[in-house]
């Protein structure tokens, strides 16, 4: 009888705790590089329950367009790659230490192309998207506050153009734009008050145990 009551009480306790998620996100428009963009995300409100996990997705978007012109007197073969690297920081020091080691890289390559003397080839515009997810389990204490709140993420871009082949005779132009966004997801256990009917059932079980003990005595 005692074991049954303990099991019943444990069942009610388990039913009271429920796993939940809450998320925040932002997205900035694509702008001509180089960019510095900032967005705001929410802290976890610790009054909602116990924070058990958090993950941050860093998102990048870019638009690439470029040309290559063969300035040599003879035909040339070359591969042109346009790229943008997005680097991150945060208003929360512990988070900044994590995201500063994460970059979102985007690129577009022409692939090997043959250029006749004086020929110009154009590539793009082409849109690219990429993202990286960081696990924030090691800094959960920094990601919550009673009543919630906000923090910021900032991204900066470094863009460039690389030419492989062509003997140094491929002249280029580029038009690059980029934008960044982010999404944070919190996982938490919400402690709910048992329903009155459940409390009554537990009370009856405990009362029954008392009667059982008295009869046994």
Regions found by a protein language model. Give the residues of each.
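Low-complexity, serine/threonine/proline-enriched polar segments
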Residues: 86-123
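Cysteine-clustered segments with highest specificity for TGF-beta superfamily mature ligands
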Residues: 112-171
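Sec-dependent signal peptide recognition
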Residues: 2-8, 198-201
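Short coil-to-beta strand junction motifs in C2/discoidin
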Residues: 71-85
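N-terminal segment immediately downstream of the Sec signal-peptide cleavage site
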Residues: 20-74, 176-180, 186-192
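Positively charged n-region of N-terminal signal peptides that target proteins for export
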Residues: 1-4, 213-217
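A short, hydrophobic C-terminal helix/tail in secreted or cell-surface proteins
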Residues: 194-212
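N-terminal signal peptide c-region/cleavage motif recognized by signal peptidases
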Residues: 14-16
């Amino acid at each position: 009888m005692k074991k049954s009551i303990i099991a019943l009480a444990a069942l009610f306790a388990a039913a009271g705790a429920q796993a939940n998620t809450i998320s925040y996100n932002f997205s900035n428009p694509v702008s001509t590089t180089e960019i510095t963009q900032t967005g705001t995300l929410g802290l976890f409100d610790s009054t909602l329950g116990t924070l058990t996990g958090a993950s941050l997705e860093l998102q990048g978007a870019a638009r690439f367009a470029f040309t290559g012109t063969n300035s040599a007197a003879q035909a040339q073969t070359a591969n042109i790659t346009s790229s943008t690297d997005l680097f991150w920081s945060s208003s929360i020091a512990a988070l900044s230490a994590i995201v500063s080691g994460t970059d979102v890289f985007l690129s577009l390559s022409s692939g090997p192309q043959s250029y006749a003397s004086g020929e110009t080839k154009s590539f793009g515009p082409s849109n690219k998207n990429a993202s990286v997810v960081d696990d924030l389990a090691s800094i959960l204490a920094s990601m919550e506050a009673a009543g919630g709140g906000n923090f910021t993420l900032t991204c900066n871009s470094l863009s460039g153009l690389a030419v492989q082949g062509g003997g140094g005779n491929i002249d280029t132009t580029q038009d690059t734009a980029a934008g960044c966004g982010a999404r944070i997801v919190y996982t938490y256990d919400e402690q709910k008050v048992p329903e009155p009917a459940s409390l009554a059932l537990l009370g009856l079980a405990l009362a029954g145990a008392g009667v059982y003990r008295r009869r046994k005595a």
